[in-house]
Curated annotation (Swiss-Prot):
The lineage of its organism: Bacteria, Bacillati, Bacillota, Bacilli, Bacillales. GO terms for molecular function: ATP binding; ATP hydrolysis activity; ATPase-coupled transmembrane transporter activity. Forms a stable energy-coupling factor (ECF) transporter complex composed of 2 membrane-embedded substrate-binding proteins (S component), 2 ATP-binding proteins (A component) and 2 transmembrane proteins (T component). It comes from the Bacteria. Disulfide bonds: none annotated. Keywords: ATP-binding, Cell membrane, Membrane, Nucleotide-binding, Translocase, Transport. This is Energy-coupling factor transporter ATP-binding protein EcfA2.
């Protein structure tokens, strides 16, 4: 499912003394089945943009098109439930939203709230619990008896049980250890490929943006500063650092190598394998 934002703008508490501009003239599209990342410093508008993707927030200017559904600023919208079924959002610390007495009931809550029968919802719960790396026996347990990592997977299963066509991820690995982060990100990537999901990741991790995204949207102060491939975005690491962002370790090491040997490699490397290949001629000569 394609998503397109055209001249999108948003103000909190518009036309009040407390009006605050959050987004201005945002133009970006997310192709059906693509994996995109949105990056930017805290306060750049990433999460505000994200909440427009399933109409949790409505634009104050411009429009957003999600599949066949068009949302135009100032036009009253009906039947937003249909849109919200198709666009699933995993927020930071989603386990904080768990509340039912069993894992199964928690996973079933969303689908049943959107009109899915209890029988069908239970079948979905059995399916998605495996998709998030857990087993069926956990369905009868209280979510509050589980580890933090298991609780997060259960919360994610609740989003997947809605059978979305678009998956929006807002810092989905916040608070996890490195191993847990990698497991969760690999899980999302596998789901993206297997289900053909349109995936949009909001992240502070440049490593994840470089590793998984096909396209990166760089934001600053509510505007889109640049749109490009990971290689294009990370080709100017100093500009990202000036914005208060980090760069992937491979990119940082490439910069150190180029300065040390006074050379310029033929491309911005995103993996260790690429970097080794690029450095090999200079290392063989003992430097340039």
């Amino acid at each position: 499912m394609e998503i397109k934002l055209e001249q999108l703008g948003y103000c909190y508490q518009k036309n009040s003394p407390f009006e605050k501009r959050a987004l201005l003239d945002v133009n970006v599209s997310f192709d059906s089945g693509s994996y995109s990342a949105i990056i930017g410093h805290t306060g750049s508008g990433k999460s505000t943009l994200l909440q427009h993707l399933n109409a949790l927030l409505m634009p104050t200017e411009g429009k957003i098109t999600v599949g066949e559904r068009e949302i135009v600023a100032g036009v009253k919208q009906k039947k937003l439930r249909d849109l919200r079924k198709k666009v699933g959002i995993v927020f930071q610390f989603p386990e904080a939203q768990l509340f039912e007495e069993t894992v199964e009931k928690d996973i079933c809550f969303g689908p049943m709230n959107f009109g899915v029968s209890e029988e069908d919802a239970k079948l979905r719960a059995k399916k998605v619990i495996y998709e998030v790396g857990l087993t069926e026996e956990i369905l009868s347990r209280s979510p509050f008896e589980l580890s933090g990592g298991q609780m997060r997977r259960v919360a994610i299963a609740g989003v997947l049980a809605m059978d979305p066509e678009v998956l929006v991820l807002d810092e989905p690995t916040a608070g996890l250890d490195p191993h847990g982060r990698e497991e969760i990100m690999e899980m999302f990537y596998n789901l993206h490929k297997e289900k053909g999901l349109t995936t949009v990741l909001v992240t502070h991790s440049m490593e994840d943006a470089a590793r998984y995204a096909e396209k990166i949207v760089l934001m600053k102060a509510g505007t889109v500063l640049q749109i490009g491939s990971p290689r294009e975005i990370f080709a100017k690491p100093d500009a990202l650092v000036d914005l208060g962002l980090s760069v992937p370790d491979v990119v940082r090491f490439q910069g150190l190598f180029e300065r040390k040997f006074n050379v310029k490699l033929t491309k911005t490397c995103l993996t260790i394998a690429e970097l080794i290949t690029e450095m090999a001629p200079y290392l063989a000569k003992g430097g340039a």
